[in-house]
Curated annotation (Swiss-Prot):
The lineage of its organism: Eukaryota, Viridiplantae, Streptophyta, Embryophyta, Tracheophyta. This is Rosmarinate synthase. Optimum pH is 7.8. The keyword Transferase applies. InterPro entries: CAT-like_dom_sf, Plant_Fungal_Acyltransferase. Keywords: Acyltransferase, Transferase. It comes from Plectranthus scutellarioides. The active site is at H152 (proton acceptor), D377 (proton acceptor).
């Protein structure tokens, strides 16, 4: 399939907005340099003549930027610290056409060679590129793809979807959803003086392979688990009874993350003494009681570490318990300690997580199940699929909801090709 760009427009707020600079928290500064997260929303044609009318979308996007004005700004340095310059330069909306049809994309596995998202030019410096970039691609079947590139220093997935859903509301003639965005990040300031209470393994270098693997191709696959399969897997696990109690059931995420971790460890066939670190992003909004509509990064990490031998020789319950213990540890004291720990670092950006963090022998499991990824309705119905579109990194996996809302979900994972077939077999042994 070929994609041809037809138009590019810099969209600015439709009314006057505040200027000045927006302070970035330590969690914002953990984002990698020169990096936008990439995702795509796919919409089937609903038969209307004005399906995803570009003029209307530009107008509603301009109005959405009045409330979400930092997206029209640019990054800048204040001394050695990044911040957002709310200079009203705008965000980019690209229009394109594709000579293929949506059904040719199959299960919508990421195909980075298919340019559904504009490439951001980082070569001219941080003050030159937009913080949010959209691409509206029309397929020959009439369907469209809305590609999104979000600069992570400004917002995490929760905040970005808040903006996109506001745009969608305005596009279809509905009022903007509440709450309004809350840009003040002072609730994530470090204490004075900083008081870290823990060693914070999540910010320590990940384990490396004792015996490096030869260079091999990687494979990306997506696996579906039905509601019945999930319930069957989850029903096998309960925490140990405490003080004569009945014990507490593990969450679906804890069970599934443990199952993925163990299956990956076995599929990789690493030595028993090889350490493996599981990275689990965690939204801290609730436990820190951040203001409604908090707009920024509120992502912390649970990072249980074990040897491959411990994961493989014990039952699945061991891996699930390690996941549960890691997530449970992230209480308010731990999260505040994390912010203080970062405050004491000379260069927070050196702790940014990336491909080096979760490649073999490690793993990244992130859940988008709780994100409202299928909420954005621009007036022509909701997406038939939404998911990541970045070049797949080995060791990265996503839990994705089914748009049919039938209780099933998908696991999208990237592994070395020689490990994927074994992983699939182990994954379905439930």
């Amino acid at each position: 399939m070929k994609i041809e760009v037809k138009d590019s427009t810099m969209i600015k707020p439709s009314a006057e907005t505040p200027g000045g600079s927006l302070w970035l928290s330590n969690l914002d500064l953990l984002s990698p340099a020169n990096y936008h997260t990439l995702s795509v929303h796919f919409y089937s044609h609903d038969g209307s003549d004005n399906f995803f009318d570009a003029a209307g979308l530009k107008e509603s996007l301009s109005r959405a930027l009045v409330e979400f004005y930092p997206y029209a700004g640019r990054l800048k340095l204040n001394g050695n610290r990044l911040e957002i310059d709310c200079n009203n330069e705008g965000l980019l909306l690209v229009e394109a056409e594709c000579d293929g049809a949506l059904d040719e994309l199959g299960d919508f596995a990421p195909r980075p060679e298919l340019n559904l998202i504009p490439k951001v030019d980082y070569s001219r410096g941080i003050s030159t590129y937009p913080l949010m970039v959209f691409q509206l691609t029309r397929f020959k079947c009439g369907g469209v793809a809305l590609g999104v590139a979000n600069e992570h220093h400004l917002s995490d997935g929760v905040a970005a979807l808040h903006f996109i859903n506001t745009w969608a509301h305005l596009s279809r003639g509905a009022p903007a959803p509440t709450p309004l965005p809350h840009f003040d990040r002072s609730s994530l300031s470090a204490r004075n003086p900083p008081q870290p209470q823990f060693s914070h393994a999540e910010y320590q270098p990940p384990p490396t392979l004792e015996n490096p693997l030869p260079h091999t191709d990687i494979a990306h696959s997506r696996f579906k688990l039905t509601r019945d399969q999930l319930n069957s897997l989850k029903s096998k696990f309960k925490t140990a009874p405490a003080d004569g109690g009945a014990g507490k059931s593990y969450s679906t995420f804890e069970v599934l993350a443990g199952h993925i971790w163990r299956s990956v460890c076995i599929a990789r066939g690493l030595p028993e003494g090889q350490e493996t670190k599981l990275h689990i992003p965690f939204d801290g909004r609730g436990r820190l009681q951040l203001p409604p509509g908090f707009f920024g990064n509120a992502i912390f990490f649970a990072t249980p570490i074990a040897t491959c031998g411990e994961i493989e020789s014990n039952s699945l319950n061991y891996a699930v318990r390690r996941v549960s213990d890691g997530v449970s540890r992230l209480d308010e004291d731990y999260l505040r300690s994390s912010i203080d720990f970062l405050e004491l670092q000379e260069d927070i950006s050196k702790l940014a997580q990336g491909a080096h963090s979760f490649r073999c022998p490690n793993l990244w499991v992130i859940s988008w199940v709780w994100l409202p990824i299928y909420e954005p309705d621009f007036g022509w119905g909701k997406a038939v699929y939404m998911g990541p579109w970045a070049a797949p990194f080995e060791g990265k996996s996503y839990l994705l909801p089914n748009p049919e809302k039938d209780g099933s979900l998908f696991v999208s994972i990237t592994l070395h090709k020689q490990h994927m077939e074994r992983f699939e077999k182990l994954f379905y042994e439930i």
